[in-house]
UniProtKB/Swiss-Prot annotation:
This is Protein Smg homolog. Belongs to the Smg family. It comes from Vibrio vulnificus (strain YJ016). InterPro entries: Smg.
Length: 159
């Protein structure tokens, strides 16, 4: 349910260029009217606050200074449980085509692990990646490419 709220917020406010200066109480009321539960709303808003805090974190600038171009990400057992082989392969693919940097990949993994869900699929990962790229300044080209990857798959490719 938390993922549903995040996607709703992203599509309603961020992706549609709607007014981003929304009062949190107003937002909570709107989400309640849309049928979401108070506890899930709270968790989703906290998740978004944590995403915003990541871009100001010193830990992520340390990641970018320490990582070598040829380094390989080793996933913890907990991360592997959440991110199946298809998801991990997709993250690697996005790094190889320069949609994700080491830093943005780690932000994506952090936010994936911050979700409270038992079910997580590749489509969910794509939305999380889009949200992270949107929230990190300087990633406009990567965001556009990721958006194309997401929507091309959804609409089908015409030959």
């Amino acid at each position: 349910m938390m993922m549903d709220i995040l996607m709703y917020l992203f599509e309603t406010y961020i992706h549609s260029d709607a007014d981003l200066q929304v009062d949190q109480d107003e937002l909570e009321d709107e989400l309640l009217r849309a049928g979401f539960h108070q506890q899930d709303i709270y968790k989703a808003l906290l998740w978004l606050e944590e995403l915003a805090a990541l871009q100001q974190s010193d830990a992520h600038s340390a990641i970018s200074r320490c990582s070598a171009v040829s380094s390989t990400r080793v996933y913890s057992p907990k991360e592997m449980q959440r991110l199946d082989i298809e998801c991990r392969g997709f993250l690697l693919f996005l790094e190889q085509i320069n949609v994700l940097t080491t830093e943005t990949r780690e932000m994506v993994i952090d936010r994936v692990m911050g979700l409270e869900t038992n079910e997580f699929e590749l489509e969910d990962l794509k939305w999380i990646i889009l949200m992270v790229l949107f929230n990190v300044p300087g990633n406009e080209n990567a965001y556009t490419l990721m958006e194309e990857l997401l929507y091309t798959k959804e609409q089908g490719i015409l030959h």
